[in-house]
Amino acid sequence: MKMIKKLIIAMSLWIFCHTLYLFIDGLNDEGKKADVAIVLGTKMNNDGTLSARLQARLDQSIVLYRQQRVKKIIVSGIGHGPNLQQAKRMHEYLLSQDIPATDIYADDKGYDTERNVKYSLAIMKENNLHSAISVSQYFHQTRAKMLFRKAGFDNISSSSPRYFEWQDIIAVPREFVAFYVEWLWTW
């Protein structure tokens, strides 16, 4: 019984520390400059419009662009179900915010974070871009940066919008599990 209690305490401490790290790492913006911001896709509204979460990510990339911290923006994501034109919708939104078409690249093949990373890196290689800032929700950044590094790309930092919603209560534990699944899967 003592061993089980110690195991439960150890697991709880591990989960707490990892979750705390997700918050610290995800909300820490080092202020670095990079060649490109990579906006990782997320769920859209059922009618095919941008969700508030996705718009917050795009708005964060616009801030980086206007502060001249990035020269280009990659939007990455295919979406699911009726929202299969996620990258197209993100591209259109950036255009509507006066980001020049020549400064936007779209990956419309990445349907999960691992593939977003893969296809974004291919776009970067094709366009001679060597550094990136991942733009996603704070809880997603640790795993996203891990996947970039596992793909052999170390020149990655992150910037997250200050957008929080009640669904984060579900997303944070899901991200905890996803981090270790990806870590083990890509080992």
Predicted regions and their residues:
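A structural signal for short, hydrophobic/glycine-enriched beta-strand patches
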Residues: 19-173
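Hydrophobic membrane-insertion alpha-helices, especially the h-region
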Residues: 5-20
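Enrichment for repetitive, rod-forming helical segments
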Residues: 12-13, 64, 181
